[in-house]
Design a protein with these regions (language model features):
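Structured surface interface patches that mediate subunit assembly and partner/cofactor docking
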Residues: 66-67
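Short "repeat-start/strand-capping" segments in structured domains, especially the N-termini
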Residues: 28-36, 48-53, 70-72, 96-103, ...
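Beta-strand-rich solenoid/repeat architectures in extracellular/passenger domains
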Residues: 11, 104-105
């Protein structure tokens, strides 16, 4: 038993960080992006807006560990490597942009759409892990949702030209609203509830 404890703790090479609870708000204007990729266990509130920017509220020593960078058309959000965060405290990430066509969650993070999405283009949502996503009012071209793992997606008031949803694993997808055509695929023990998607 003791050997297992030592071998487990030795996996963390970097420092152990606990939130200071000295809360600050960091605001940053961003280059244009229409795709978000987040890795980790943080939660995001996304809001469609005229400008591209991010606001992070949290403990000062946790906020400084969060890396946000636009590469091409993608905003990447992740914690710095080799840091073991044991207690973040409150952490709220607000992301704003004029348009959004892609979203990828890697890990156990979550995203809430504050005012939905209105786009003439498509919206592709991918969850790798146990992340969760929710919101209402999705006015899009093709809406594509894919879960690889045990993620959870709940979207309401959909108005899309077409819609596809797929699960590899034990995830759950719940959809309601309207679409021109829908296609579903499940590999594993996942569940897609789309009876209210007409």
């Amino acid at each position: 038993g003791i050997i297992l404890i030592f071998s487990a703790t030795s996996c963390f090479n970097g420092p152990i960080v606990k939130g200071s609870k000295n809360y600050i708000t960091k605001k940053e204007n961003l280059e244009h992006f229409n795709d978000i990729s987040m890795s980790g266990s943080a939660n995001i509130i996304y809001q469609q807006d005229s400008s591209s920017r991010i606001e992070i509220y949290g403990s000062d020593n946790i906020v400084e560990l969060l890396e946000t960078k636009v590469n091409g058309e993608t905003l990447n959000i992740k914690f710095k490597k080799n840091v073991n965060i044991i207690d973040k405290g409150k952490l709220e990430i607000k992301v704003f942009s004029p348009d959004l066509n892609g979203l990828t969650l890697n890990g156990s993070g979550g995203i809430l759409f504050a005012n939905g999405i209105h786009t003439e283009g498509d919206l592709k949502v991918t969850i790798n892990g146990s992340g969760n996503l929710g919101g209402s009012t999705f006015d899009t071209g093709h809406l594509a949702i894919a879960i690889h793992g045990s993620g959870d997606v709940r979207l309401k008031q959909i108005d899309s030209k077409t819609c596809s949803a797929s699960i590899s694993g034990s995830g759950n997808i719940t959809l309601d609203g309207m679409t021109g055509a829908a296609k579903y695929n499940i590999s594993g023990s996942g569940n897609i509830k789309a009876a209210d998607l007409e």
